[in-house]
A protein has these predicted regions:
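Intrinsically disordered, low-complexity regulatory regions of plant transcription factors
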Residues: 1-34, 55-79, 85-105
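N-terminal amphipathic alpha-helical or helix-forming assembly modules
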Residues: 44, 51-54, 58-60, 289
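Eukaryotic helix-grip
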Residues: 86, 94-571
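Generic low-polarity alpha-helical segments
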Residues: 1, 16-23, 47, 323, ...
């Protein structure tokens, strides 16, 4: 049979692999036809929407073109969500074993809210005066709630009794492609790292990954902790849906809205918030950020209520400022291993400090002392990869300082003045050994540094170093630092893995103060860590507590003397 097959092929002049090639050509032709059909479908959909828009315009010519576009977009979104619901139900079924009835109904309710939240966010991004007014505190804009309530029906229902509203808008241009930014917003870890220190714990559940090959139509159920670096401001716990929509070519909208709010007054309700992203010819992305929340103001210390109400604490300007700072930091020297390692270690140090101040993250702390007007003392068990174990104690305290936050920040970075306020490291942090900026602006003091001195580590005869991150923007300033040894510095300089390096960060967070009577100044939060080797929490003594109280008091006194050398008051 083999010879017959061979003779037949040679007689006809057809090669042995003709069936394979023929199949490949058929498949290629089918793929081409499928691609052309998709293009025709898209063009047909665009023509259908244009036809619908023209009919609507003829019915009511008094409406503006923008209003007609909004109406058509809203209808399109409703159709899209309806299609998503059908697709989702076909995939999982309301009564399939892969998903319970309750979960399916809940998912359907999430989908139902999406077009309304998207429509509201898009309108809030497009409209200007008189709905938005320039903020009196820093940059950005604040919402006129009277006009808002008149123009927009409550997407999430009536505001909880006793809650107050806060809404702000800010804009910026980030050096990142729009598609990359959308992908980062879909990934919990990247989202948290992108907004350095603002986000504590974050968990996600994917409801839909979006259309094939993109995040268009993606839907996430998220829970996150959003924090201001002070023990006087409770962490904002948010349960929300994140919906991603490709509005047009180069234009994406990402909207968040609260779900499962319940009756817990500690939760913050997130009204339609998020960002409108527009691709730019140079590869950057123009971001319009909108943050709209409702919360119980009585849970916030009175010294911080003005800050939060103005939007500086949790508002859009802070999100945009954090994003700009992080993106500008990522861009230079991205492939330099030393810089990458140093930045990673500094990020972990900052995260540890923020988690201690705000009691977020995964560490469990035990309250040791919390007397009004005195530092809050906490403790937890500690065991690192080098075999060091014991108890870590922390002290956190917030105080008002009569100085602009930016001015105070810059004074603290003057090396000759460090001994005035730094009670532990002023003899170590005397000169820069290695430093890289967090901004390309030469007038900006934001940087990560390793500070050096001639002070030797006890018993080792090696000089101690200080790892420090300093950052500031219109919403506040932060200085975080920790003592590190010579082997750690060598590891960083070689671009090694620093994830196992033990850190006990010290830090100061400085935010603007907005008093009820127009007073200015700054609210400063001081945080310390101290390790008690080979100890347990039950063995903590009064002297251990007093030592931390003394460190905080001396730091606060130093800050007051920094801005007023004649000041001799304590905490």
């Amino acid at each position: 049979m083999g010879s017959l097959s061979k003779c037949g092929n040679s007689r006809s002049g057809t090669p042995d692999n003709f069936p394979i090639r023929a199949n490949e050509e058929v498949v290629a032709q089918q793929e081409q036809e499928r691609h052309e059909n998709e293009i025709l479908k898209q063009q047909n959909e665009e023509l259908r929407l244009q036809n619908l828009a023209m009919k609507e315009f003829l019915k009511n010519p008094h409406k503006s073109i923008f209003e007609h576009k909004i109406c058509i977009e809203n209808a399109r979104l409703k159709e899209k969500i309806h299609a998503m619901t059908i697709q989702y139900n076909q995939s999982y079924g309301l009564n399939e074993t892969r998903m319970g009835i309750d979960m399916a109904i809940q998912t359907k309710s999430y989908l139902k809210l999406a077009p309304y939240a998207m429509d509201e966010l898009f309108k809030l991004g497009a409209l200007n005066d008189p709905l938005w007014n320039k903020s009196t505190h820093g940059q950005g804009e604040t919402l006129d709630f009277k006009l808002y309530e008149w123009a927009f029906p409550p997407c999430l229902g009536p505001k909880p009794h006793g809650f107050v509203s806060e809404a702000s808008r800010a804009k910026g241009v980030i050096p990142m492609a729009t598609s990359d930014f959308v992908e980062a917003l879909f990934n919990a870890d990247r989202w948290r790292d992108m907004f350095g220190g603002m986000i504590g714990r974050c968990t996600t559940k994917v409801i839909s990954n979006g259309a094939r090959g993109s995040r268009n139509g993606a839907l996430l159920l998220m829970k996150a902790e959003i924090q201001v670096f002070s023990s006087f401001v409770p962490v904002r716990v948010l349960n929300f849906i994140r919906y991603v929509n490709k509005h047009a070519e180069g234009l994406w909208v990402v909207v968040d809205y609260s779900v499962d709010f319940g009756t817990d007054r500690r939760l913050t309700r997130r009204c339609p918030s998020g960002c409108i992203l527009q691709s730019m010819p140079n590869g950057c992305t123009k971001v319009t950020w909108i943050e709209h929340t409702e919360y119980d103001e009585q849970l916030i210390h009175e010294n911080y209520r003005g800050l939060i109400r103005s939007g500086v604490g949790f508002g859009a300007q802070r999100w945009v400022s954090a994003l700009l700072g992080q993106c500008k930091c990522i861009a230079p020297n991205l492939f330099e291993s030393t810089t990458r390692c140093l930045r990673s270690l500094a990020q972990r140090m900052r995260r540890m400090f923020c988690a201690t101040v705000c009691l977020t993250g995964w560490e469990r702390w035990n309250l040791v002392a919390n007397v009004p007007g005195r530092p809050r003392i906490m403790a937890r068990m500690y065991n690192n990869f080098q075999g060091v174990s014991g108890v870590v104690m922390s002290a956190t305290h917030s105080v008002w300082i009569a100085a602009n936050h930016r001015h105070l920040f810059e004074m603290m970075l003057i090396k000759d003045l460090r001994s005035v306020w730094d009670v532990l490291c002023h003899t170590i942090a005397t000169r820069d050994m290695y430093s890289f900026p967090l901004s390309q602006d030469e007038a900006n003091f934001n940087c990560v540094s390793i500070l050096d001195s001639n002070t030797l580590q006890a018993g080792v005869n090696q000089p101690l170093k200080v790892l420090q991150e300093a950052s500031s923007d219109t919403t506040g300033s932060l200085i975080v630092y920790a003592i590190v040894d010579t082997p750690t510095v060598a590891l960083v300089m070689q671009g090694g893995d620093s994830s196992r390096v033990g850190l006990l960060p010290i830090g100061l967070s400085i935010v603007p103060y907005h008093g009820e009577s127009g007073e200015s100044g700054s609210m400063v939060t001081v945080g310390f860590h101290r390790l008690l080797r080979n100890q347990v929490i039950s063995n903590i003594t009064v002297e251990n507590i007093n030592t931390l109280n003394r460190l905080v008091a001396q730091t606060v006194q130093g800050l007051k003397m920094l801005v007023d050398p004649l000041n001799e008051e304590g905490m």
